[in-house]
Amino acid sequence: MCGDSPIPFVFFLSLGLTCGPAKTTYATDSQWRSIAGPVTAQIIRIIDGDTLEVDAHPWPGHAVRVSVRLRGIDTPERRSRCAGQRAAAQLARNELERLVTGFSTVELINVSGGKYYGCVLADMKAGKRDIASAMLASGLARPYQGGKRHKPECAG
């Protein structure tokens, strides 16, 4: 029980009767599928060149630990059979780490469900820098809008 006095309840009841019922609005199905943001997050670890684990703070006093895949890019895979791709994956991971080092928090924008359970897809900013754009500019990521991913030939 929040309090012993009926006065607050009576006040809000009389306000409702005087002003009439408030209009209730509900989110549409598409609104439930994404969060415009920004959502403040602290980076826990860099997983690879396009995925990070963060503690996101969608509401005051609450944190959600989640993997975030950067929207619009793809980087080489760490678990590739090709040694050249594994080396490129490490370079991409190092670049992502460099881009976010020194920022105590980042912002997640346009957060939506990812392709795989437990991962969300989002745009990310560290300061004023868009991280996906910076990864593309580095040459260590390629544009990716979903669907079949590019698989380079293995030279060795």
Locate predicted features.
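Small beta-barrel nucleic-acid-binding modules, primarily SNase/OB-fold domains
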Residues: 2-156
